[in-house]
UniProtKB/Swiss-Prot annotation:
GO BP field: amino acid activation for nonribosomal peptide biosynthetic process; antibiotic biosynthetic process; secondary metabolite biosynthetic process
InterPro entries reported in the protein's UniProt record: AA_adenyl_dom, ACP-like_sf, AMP-bd_C_sf, AMP-dep_synth/lig_dom, ANL_N_sf, Epimerase_deHydtase, NAD(P)-bd_dom_sf, PP-bd_ACP
Domain description: Contains an N-terminal adenylation domain, an internal peptidyl carrier domain and a C-terminal domain that is homologous to nicotinamide-dependent dehydrogenases.
EC number(s) recorded for this UniProt protein: 6.2.1.-
Keyword Nucleotide-binding among UniProt keywords: yes
Protein's recorded name: Non-ribosomal peptide synthetase CmlP
Carrier domain residues: 492-568
Reaction catalysed by this enzyme: 4-amino-L-phenylalanine + holo-[peptidyl-carrier protein] + ATP = 4-amino-L-phenylalanyl-[peptidyl-carrier protein] + AMP + diphosphate
Phylogenetic lineage: Bacteria, Bacillati, Actinomycetota, Actinomycetes, Kitasatosporales
Modification O-(pantetheine 4'-phosphoryl)serine occurs at: S526
Top-level taxonomic group: Bacteria
Amino acid sequence: MVELPDLLTDLFRRHRGRTALRTAGRTWTYEELDRVTSALARRIDAECPAGRRVLVAGEHTAEAVVWALAAMRSHAVHTPMNPGLPADRFEEFARVADAALLVCFEREALVRGEKAGLRALYAGDVGWPTDPAPAPADGTADEPARSRVAYSIFTSGSTGDPKLVDVGHGGLLNLCRSLRRLLDITPDDQVLHFASLSFDASVSEILGTLYAGATLVVPVRDQASWLGSVSRHLAAHGCDLAMLSPSVYARLDEAARSRIRKVEFCGEALGEGEYDKAARYSRVFNAYGPTEATVCFSLAELTSYTPSIGTPVDGFRAYVRDPDSGDHATAGTGELVIVGDGVALGYAGGSPAENEVFGTVDGSPAYATGDVVSLSDDGELTYLGRIDEQIKRLGHRVNLAHVGSTLSRHLGREVALVRQDATILLVTAADGEATEESLMARIRDLVPVWEAPDRLVLVDALPLTSGGKVDRSALRELLASPAGAPHGGTDGEDAAELRRVLDVVTAVLGQEIGPETSIFDAGGSSLAMIQIQVKLSDAYGEEAVEAAFAAMDYDFAPAAFLRHLRGEAVAPAESAVDTLLRRVETERDALRAELPLLRRDTRHEPVPGAADGDREVLLTGASGFIGGHVLDRLLAAGRPVLVVSTGDPDGVLTGHATRFGRQAADYARVRAISYAELERWVDRRRGPVVDAVVHCGYQVNHLLPLDSHLSGSVRNTALVVRAAAALGARSFAFLSAASAGADFLPLSAATLTAVGDPYSRSKLISEEYVNTLAVLGCAVSHYRPGLVYGHRPEDRHHLKDDWFTALLETARRVGAMPRLSGHVPVCDVGTLADTLLGRPDANPGTADGASRTPDSRSAVVVHRTYALDELLRHTGLTEADVLAPAAWFERVRDGGEVPAPLLAAMQAALSGPGWPSAHREVDHDILGRLLGTPPDTPAGDRPERTGTTAEAQNGAAHAPTPR
């Protein structure tokens, strides 16, 4: 039996010089993948004990594919996981996996990993896979034994709960051979990588391609949705083979479908309509295979439509089980039982009842699928359906009864899930309080998108049978009648109007969504939301559309948009801002009540290596641009520092030393811990004495939904506040953002409403939590800086996602600048770092904070501003090169070189009014130094200083909110 790591090693070396992996602007040969994945596998082995699971939480990038291959080659067990799972679901999956390591590609996942008790490795900290960080090696250690599990992968199973399938090595070679032979994959083929790594179809894509010596091509996500990006890629470049579900294929543009030479349908039953569309352009294959059968069990090439799912691939046999006798037959109709070495080893941690589907037939491993098939005498299979209520949506198995039970429990109301053709309706009784919108919002928080209903229907009462159960037959009749139509339903002109809105959404997302479906649940982004808003403004007017979007709190769903547009939005429903405020006030009050108890009950421990009475400065965000400079100044001052990090604590200090050219001895008085460790200190009421807190750690992303900020950076801020109370901090400096507003006002619905984007709202909420420290006499300061620069060469990687420098570079490249209103406020990182440290460094030996009068140095911080003419000079452009923003973005978008998230960030930033007046507080040209352009105007020609940071303290401000 060939094991997966050995199979990959053989393939890499067999096809050495050929191209194995390609994405825009980057290719890897098989030889390069051999070297890179081997090095990364060693890194995984250094972090994860042999035989334990490593969760790889990434998708749709070449980098994620490289790490997945590294995990397959390691001594750990590769276990891919969807990075977009709801937070509770993420923790549940991590618990089921009992993993020892999480590899992630977004920093938000680090927080989730720590919350789930996982050791986390951020791929960006390791380095781009072509130059991986060296892993420690122990030449005296024996090579650990390989696990009998080749990989583990999640499936929801027939219960709807996550099940982790352990797949052995036995069926992998047969899978590769069968795919190459039956799909006619040649070394010259370009194979599309579409599936998320968390779907086992990705195993077929990756291993089938590598076995044949072909090239796996990963499209760049340059559209609002992954599907839209893939459709655009296919229209431009085509592919030789795509493995897609019928529902995905149906949503591809005609231009994309016409460029696919071969298409293998999988994941769902293939209908005649999809076959006819595909057969116009492509060779068509139909595949079938549960996760428990090493991806693919049967495969057929279709030359005319038939529901056949083919014959078993190499190494498998098919039987049908008679439901009455339990006998297994080689022909007939019944439950399909798969037999062969490719049958999975079982469900990890599954109960005996769950694992009853695994057994043996004639001494060989067998799996009872729960699928009803017809098996002909010559071995051809026809899929007929499920033997239970389970259906398949978006590649996941979903049991409607289980989902209904889950939602009934969490919503506190009786619900019924009903199928109407391909649409899933959730039906519940109207009670005069909950609305369709509020219920759908809660449902989206409770279950992943593939379990969420397409529509929600409120009825007067759920019909019951004589036995007291919901009468689904009567319910379907009720829904079919005019009286039972969904509340807010449309017909005639209303239906036509809804159709127009849906068409706009389809044009932007590249796929059709349900009327009540949020575009974010459908994979859309903030950029997509902006594009939809612009298109709808052309039809309905800018003010009306803006009001409707604001009323929806920018969580756009087509039918909800029309209700708000017509003034039909449910009046009794609490507004999104009011709901948010109530939630924040509840958590703030609980925090305020807890802080004195934490201060009273925490036992303080001596700081290792510190003199008596020497207190540490607690610093977050040391791996970030600003926080790194703050740490460098603390080191220069000789202060003891406690660094709290979302990443690997030791890696933060190593990275800082490299970035600032420091030696290990410089960090003798520095300790680094994780947020999870800090939380343990707080919860057990024991820890060191802290003098001051400087909180710089925050994920800067104006496009993330507010819930992501609340569960990530805001949650971390609340933890740091609790730690400040427990560890006796006498001052707390919080690095906020100028986009949170110019005035330091009490938090209210009005102040939240005045701040447009979720990131800035989250900063206001974090400030409110920090303010609770006033009950302890802790001096709190919030600093709201403009755009912060002063990057040295070692800091340049921090500019990767910076919208403003990206805008300037794009302006240089396209030879045009968008017309900006007002000025751009900028800060110097060195001056800002000194400001943040003004309090902890001023007098570290002052009296205990409890006896101090609480004060604040809160300020909006701007060191100088830049007007349009200055930006033109820095980019080498003139007034003649200035375009209206809409025209400029159209030119840039057509060029296709700016990543969609950066483009969306630019658009969001330029939608604001800008800084109203010129301001200069530093003598040097911050942007000139950054961009390497000549010095600016002589001192005599400069505008007068119009204010200083100090003037904004205690509520004064320079100007309205900047971009």
